[in-house]
Regions:
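Positively charged, small/polar-rich N-terminal and surface patches that mediate targeting and assembly
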Residues: 1-105
Length: 105
């Protein structure tokens, strides 16, 4: 299992979610509105508020789906402009179902 975490522009969320839902056996995702900044900082002449609205998308997926999902995120969240976002992939060593109180495989 792998965790995929992406930081994208808010207006890209619906398009991304629709594309991911087309995948057979897509396990689902969480999305939350956040504020942050990276290299695309605000011009210092503007009123100072370095934080930009973003959406953080998280999902835990089987190893064999990682490349396909990352490609979809890179395609669907791309505008070609600064601040398009980032995608991170990290291993998940264990997962548990709270309802079933069992470890998931």
């Amino acid at each position: 299992m792998q965790e995929i975490r992406a930081y994208i522009k808010p207006f890209m969320l619906e398009k991304l979610a629709l594309a991911l839902m087309e995948l057979p056996n897509f396990p689902g995702m969480s999305a939350m509105t956040i504020k942050g900044f990276g290299k695309e900082r605000v011009d210092r002449l503007q009123e100072f508020d370095p934080f930009i609205d973003k959406v953080r998308v998280e999902m835990i997926v089987p190893d064999d789906m990682v490349e396909q999902i990352v490609r979809i995120i890179l395609t669907e969240a791309h505008s070609g402009n600064p601040g398009d976002g980032k995608v991170y992939v990290a291993p998940v060593s264990r997962a548990f179902s709270i309802r079933l109180q069992t470890e998931e495989k």
